[in-house]
Structures are given as C-alpha cells and as structure tokens.
Amino acid sequence: MTARKPTKPNLRPVRELTPTLQYRTIHGYRRAFRIAGSGPAILLIHGIGDNSTTWSSVQSTLAQRFTVIAPDLLGHGKSDKPRADYSVAAYANGMRDLLSVPDIERVTVIGHSLGGGVAMQFAYQFPQLVDRLILVGAGGVTKDVNFALRIASLPMGSEALALLRLPLVLPALQVFGRVAGAAIGSTGLGRDLPEMLRILEDLPEPTASSAFARTLRA
C-alpha cells in the first residue's frame, strides 16, 4: 500500500490593517487618535511622554479581529497641549468622551505606564463601559518611578526640559545614551534609557515640554 503523503495545511496570509489618524474636538480641545479594524472594541492608552504610535504593530495585529482605538492623550502626540487638568481622572473623562464619538458602549482597556493608571481610573469611574482591564507596567501599581522622571518632576524640572531646545543638547544626550547604555545596559536605568531618550526627542517643542511637566506633577 502506498503511503499517503501528508497534506499541506491551507495557510492564509495574515492581514494587517493600517491605523488611520483622525481628529475630534472635544470640550474645545482637539484630540488625535488612531483607529483600525472592526468588531469588539479595544482601547490602547500609552504612557507619559509617549503617543499612540507606540502601539502601531500591536494595533495592526489586533485590528484583524477588533475595533482598536489608540488615542494621543491630551498634552501628547498630535493632540492639543493646553494649560489644563492632566490628572488621571481628567484623562479618564477624556477617554469616555472620545469613545462616545464612534458610539462605543463597552471596551477592553489596555494601558501602559501612565496609561495603566488612566485605565484603572477609567474602570473605577465607568465600570459599565469596561469589559476587561489589562495593565502593562502600569503607573500607580508600585512605588517605582524612573529616575529621570523624578528629576523632571522637581521644581526646576521645566527649566531642565527647556534646555532640550538649545542647539546640540539633544544630540549630545543621544550620544551619551548610546555610550551609557553599553556600560549600564543590564541595570534598571540602562534598560529604561533608550525609552527615555525616545520620549525626550519629542519634547523640544515648548508646548510639549510644558504639558509633559504638568502631567508629571499631576
């Protein structure tokens, strides 16, 4: 009897959906968010000093099965950066208002860093809107705070961030980061350094650094 050849599985290519950037004006402030996919809703909330692009690859993958919304928090990314309330409660209210735009009734909330704190506050304030809560290195769960963030939150932190607008300061920090990263890469600070430098690259704009400092103090 001739042995039957194993059949090859019918593999289909994985389809990625590219998020589209949209804007909505809510309570007088322009909010930016990226949305992709269809199906049950997922809300991705980024960390302090970051923006929605940090979720790009995750959002495209999840969008194959879900409606995935990744906002730029107020004071971050392409959203407005006013002199406003940057507390987690205010951010949670902003997330509720943003979800009302596409008329989403319930959502799985995923938060990283500050976004984790916002996600927890959102679940506390609006439990009727939350299906699941997922935290990734969430702020407010432990007392650990990045050393650089501690410095930036001090009274002179805003002045220190303003130095990023001077010529050659940011390039010098980037060179220092590469050298220091090689030397202390196995330590907690070494692991955080590349992420911190990536965030600092977005802060030379005066409104961005001011919003960053206000968020830290909130």
Say what each PLM segment does.
Residues 1-42, 63-66, 93, 97, ...:
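Alpha/beta-hydrolase fold catalytic core
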Residues 44-47, 113, 138:
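Glycine-rich His-Gly loop
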Residues 29-78:
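Conserved HGGG/HGGXW glycine-rich cap/lid loop of the alpha/beta-hydrolase fold
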Residues 24-36, 70-114, 126:
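Active-site loop/oxyanion-hole signature of alpha/beta-hydrolase fold enzymes
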